[in-house]
Regions:
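Bacterial Sec-dependent N-terminal signal peptides
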Residues: 1-25, 202
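Short N-terminal segments immediately surrounding and downstream of signal-peptide cleavage
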Residues: 21-42
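Second-shell loop/turn segments in exported
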Residues: 24-30, 52-58, 63-69, 124-133, ...
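Metal-centered catalytic cores of metalloenzymes
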Residues: 33-39, 136, 154-156
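Hydrophobic packing residues in well-ordered alpha-helices of helical domains and bundles
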Residues: 34, 134-138, 175-178
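Acidic interhelical loop/turn segments
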Residues: 43-58, 116-128, 143-174
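Short, contiguous alpha-helical
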Residues: 55-105, 151, 155-202
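Surface-exposed, polar helix/loop patches in the mature regions of secreted/periplasmic/lumenal proteins
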Residues: 86-149
């Protein structure tokens, strides 16, 4: 989770640079963004074999399989963080503390100019043998997330404010972060596939 903490610092300090005060996303758009990010992952890994899934472009750089495993293990952790916020009493006085916009979150999290070395937790990550195996694991966690979103109104998600070490975001934005985080790693998968040494199909 260390790298996610770095992302949050970048995210919540990027508001002044990215912010263009505009209407945020609605709940339907949030759900569609989750669907879109899943479909994009499916497109990127479709047809890859086990060798391609485990290929790493170099030391400290993740394979497609590691990117997928990272999403599978971190999305439930991030959801739990949002769940705890929703279970806590609302503090209306914090609502004005949210300065970052939905657009800021997507732009900052998907910005691949900020990169970090692979964490030790993934160096020995299991290798998925097929795209279907990876997608099945991710699909299960996505269903839980979408069911969670369905339990609340947009107003309820906006009224619960999460305090990060460097700022504030509402619970809706915490969920948006999960989908944007997947979009970020989809771009990373594209980078892996574009490496000159990436194994070719026979």
């Amino acid at each position: 989770m260390k790298k996610l903490t770095i992302f949050l610092v970048l995210l919540l300090t990027a508001g002044d640079a990215f912010s263009q005060q505009q209407a945020g996303m609605n709940k339907q758009e949030l759900l569609e963004y989750f669907d879109q990010t899943f479909a994009n992952i499916q497109t990127e890994i479709e047809g890859l074999n086990a060798e391609q899934l485990k290929f790493s472009p170099g030391e400290g750089r993740w394979s497609v399989s590691q990117c997928l495993y990272h999403l599978v293990i971190t999305e439930p952790q991030l959801l739990e963080f949002v769940r705890q916020a929703m279970d806590a009493p609302a503090d209306p006085s914090l609502k004005d503390s949210v300065k970052i916009t939905d657009r800021d979150i997507i732009m900052a999290v998907t910005d691949r100019s900020h990169k970090a070395k692979a964490e030790n937790e993934l160096t020995d990550a299991p290798v998925y043998s097929s795209p279907r195996e990876a997608l099945s694991a991710l699909e299960s966690s996505r269903k839980i997330i979408k069911d969670f979103i369905g339990k609340y109104t947009e107003e309820e998600l906006r009224n619960k404010v999460i305090k990060w070490p460097v700022g504030y975001a509402d619970a809706f934005q915490g969920l948006l972060f999960i989908a944007a985080h997947a979009a970020r790693h989809t771009e990373q998968m594209k980078e892996v596939k574009s490496d000159p040494s990436f194994p070719k199909l026979p």
